[in-house]
């Protein structure tokens, strides 16, 4: 994911948590906040230490980032997203992670996701 698509600062995460709406499935929670003045989407990732050690957490983040990279043309611009991984995603394959992200994005009301 390019820098323009990342949320890094704590106050930006907090804004999305407090003002955004959340959607969830068994593997992920997605907070979504509309930002009309923003030309593209931004995504922040959160993987708790409860999920596993650093190797497991980094693997999950890499799979999420790769899924987002493949879906970037279908994700609505002008929005901030925070994706929180839940414990079941520690044992998932890349295809399952991508499918689960598509599912939770569709539940959040994104019309452009087709896959």
Curated annotation (Swiss-Prot):
GO terms for cellular component: ribonuclease P complex. It comes from the Bacteria. Keywords: Endonuclease, Hydrolase, Nuclease, RNA-binding, tRNA processing. It catalyses: Endonucleolytic cleavage of RNA, removing 5'-extranucleotides from tRNA precursor. It is an enzyme of class 3 (hydrolase). Gene3D superfamilies: 3.30.230.10. InterPro entries: Ribosomal_Su5_D2-typ_SF (IPR020568), Ribsml_uS5_D2-typ_fold_subgr (IPR014721), RNase_P (IPR000100), RNase_P_CS (IPR020539). Consists of a catalytic RNA component (M1 or rnpB) and a protein subunit. HAMAP family: RNase_P (MF_00227). RNaseP catalyzes the removal of the 5'-leader sequence from pre-tRNA to produce the mature 5'-terminus. It can also cleave other RNA substrates such as 4.5S RNA. The protein component plays an auxiliary but essential role in vivo by binding to the 5'-leader sequence and broadening the substrate specificity of the ribozyme. NCBIfam families: rnpA. This is Ribonuclease P protein component. It comes from Bacillus cereus (strain Q1).
